[in-house]
Amino acid sequence: MKIKEIRLLPLRGATPDGGWDEKLLRGETNLHTLVEVVTDEGVTGLGSVFTSETLIRGALDVIEPFLIGASALDPTATSERLHQQSFWQGRGGAITHAISGIDIALWDILGKVTGQPISRLLGGRFRETIKPYGSVLMDEPDKLRAALEDGLARGFRAFKIGWGPFGRVDARTDESIVRVARE
């Protein structure tokens, strides 16, 4: 089973206030892209990339020649080959994101073809349950407190606090942000 085509499916929608600088977005609403790998036998796999279609398309221009015609059933070897071949093209950033999406899609294909859950293919289940966490943007102390309280009300007991004003205003604001998060 060979890789025939790579398709990009941009996801569009609003972004949370404070998540991105408008100068970076310039009207762009696509910050997440699905990567679809299509095989010569019609089996498809999907991978998810937290990067715009524009950047992933640019990365594909570099790595796609190493994909078309390659085995769709050996994700580890394919990902390693892509990393090796793209080393001098800017290892990291959009190229690494694109490889990640392709890797996920290839594992999806392998799971479908073998009839196995991907967790088993990756070494088996190690936990029966997982503890989900809420992901919130770091914000001014009062806004952060409101976001954390909302997450607690929705049942989350752990949080990942993303980027924001930390280190950008002053030490007093930073201390307040940490204090609110610890409460």
Summary of predicted features, one role per range:
Residues 128-183:
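Metal-dependent enolase-superfamily TIM-barrel catalytic cores that perform enediolate-based chemistry
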Residues 41, 89, 113-137:
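N-terminal small/glycine-rich loop or linker at the start of catalytic domains
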Residues 59, 74, 78, 98, ...:
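General structural feature for long, well-ordered alpha-helical segments within catalytic domains
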Residues 38-113:
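Metal- or metallocofactor-binding catalytic centers and their adjacent structured scaffolds
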Residues 10, 51, 163:
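Residues that line or immediately flank small-molecule/substrate-binding pockets and catalytic motifs
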Residues 26-29, 124-126, 183:
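Solvent-exposed alpha-helices and their adjacent loops that cap or buttress functional pockets
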Residues 1-47:
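Structured beta-strand/loop patches that form or line metal/cofactor-binding pockets in enzymes
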